[in-house]
Amino acid sequence: MAKKVAVIGAGVSGLISLKCCVDEGLEPTCFERTEDIGGVWRFKENVEDGRASIYQSVITNTSKEMSCFSDFPMPEDFPNFLHNSKLLEYFRIFAKKFDLLKYIQFQTTVLSVRKCPDFSSSGQWKVVTQSNGKEQSAVFDAVMVCSGHHILPHIPLKSFPGIERFKGQYFHSRQYKHPDGFEGKRILVIGMGNSGSDIAVELSKNAAQVFISTRHGTWVMSRISEDGYPWDSVFHTRFRSMLRNVLPRTAVKWMIEQQMNRWFNHENYGLEPQNKYIMKEPVLNDDVPSRLLCGAIKVKSTVKELTETSAIFEDGTVEENIDVIIFATGYSFSFPFLEDSLVKVENNMVSLYKYIFPAHLDKSTLACIGLIQPLGSIFPTAELQARWVTRVFKGLCSLPSERTMMMDIIKRNEKRIDLFGESQSQTLQTNYVDYLDELALEIGAKPDFCSLLFKDPKLAVRLYFGPCNSYQYRLVGPGQWEGARNAIFTQKQRILKPLKTRALKDSSNFSVSFLLKILGLLAVVVAFFCQLQWS
């Protein structure tokens, strides 16, 4: 008899968890509090309690080839970085392809998840839900929590003396939808993460002036990398990941600093991070430098105090006649349907084995999916988490002892602090490729490079030096997909397809030109050595 699994949430993590349950022969039921799938990526004009809310212009910071699910590439005509509506379209295609909607109960809120009396032997859970004012309860063999971590808006008003006197408008960035109504205003955006930067750039087109306050500074990256390819397809390779792991920390940090400053000098723009050697997640924004050059945005230090109409900053400067303050200060998360003894959230931190399993339970039948911030795409990360979790639920994979898991949690947290610092916004941060490989190893889906060097050297080279995308984890092991190898070799075609909207007469001239340059360079070298010999 198939084990019954409750999946809480029908966003990215919930959808892929449903598919993984079905793939493993489990019987899932998904509870989604709203009327549709998509989670944080589904734009709505109104703000809903307990749900993150995006602005209309949001696009992805990770590219389509690095963000698609491992056996379902995005259509080749999709742009590399997707508008939220386009990403939602992909989710709908995915859900239809694998017939996932039939497992979802919409407009159903999970009120509580409690252990059954015989949990120590059965591992079962009693799940109480509410829909249309009626409560229902059911028993499940396992639970996958997929409600995400963009839940409660974090507005630290106590850190801003005088906010109660401020006569203008102030609100959290989740309430911002579009620039209408902010024309001619003097606006202060507090917080320079991705949302704060996006909002500041968008408002600066029609506002009188936009200021952005950053406590520690930040690195700003372009989505466009070497030769015009998406940044993550260049940055996230196993070769580069290996270098970052084996080289001395000082060398790695120096390399990162050089890479970040290659686009523009962050010190000159007042953006250089206070602690350059903490690997804080960079801001992905192609417009910030130009808006700073135009003077449309001005970078400010931490706000020290607010008056009725002005902002006083820690460096002693004052900006008068502020009309609007937008707090782009992130989110905190909680699980109101779980007891603290199950998953305790403290200072925006949770103690979970590999960011997934509570270590202290008698039975490993509760898991959190997507409660992590990788330095890369969340989509393949959540997928590998779900693939592992469903195999644990089915009894095909096992977890180590509680003591071993607790030691891993402590060690992982120490490493996280060392790499990313102790900021509340970095509590879920982790390296990308390393974490994916770690999960893949648990289910036997990590490619064996030594073996591939002999069996398929061309593929081995692609895996090691090319983009580390999700297809790699469908080459071997459970859930092997026969289309994985082809997807790896055709990814460049899908990257370039949406860009080649203008037909060129003949691209062969480029090859000839390149060859002539090489021959010319060789001629110069030969001439140089000949001259040395004659002299």
UniProtKB/Swiss-Prot annotation:
Residues the record lists as N-acetylalanine modifications: A2
Swiss-Prot/TrEMBL cofactor(s): FAD; Mg(2+)
Cell compartment(s), UniProt: Microsome membrane; Endoplasmic reticulum membrane
EC number: 1.14.13.-
Binding site for FAD: G9, A10, G11, V12, S13, E32, V40, W41, N61, T62
The protein's name: Dimethylaniline monooxygenase [N-oxide-forming] 2
Organism: Pan troglodytes
One Pfam family from the record: FMO-like
Top-level taxon of origin: Eukaryota
Alphabetical GO biological process terms: energy homeostasis; NADP metabolic process; negative regulation of fatty acid oxidation; organic acid metabolic process; oxygen metabolic process; toxin metabolic process; xenobiotic metabolic process
Gene: FMO2
Covalent cross-link (Glycyl lysine isopeptide (Lys-Gly) (interchain with G-Cter in SUMO)), residues: K492
Function, as annotated: Catalyzes the oxidative metabolism of numerous xenobiotics, including mainly therapeutic drugs and insecticides that contain a soft nucleophile, most commonly nitrogen and sulfur and participates to their bioactivation.
Keywords from the UniProt entry: Acetylation, Endoplasmic reticulum, FAD, Flavoprotein, Isopeptide bond, Magnesium, Membrane, Microsome, Monooxygenase, NADP, Oxidoreductase, Transmembrane, Transmembrane helix, Ubl conjugation
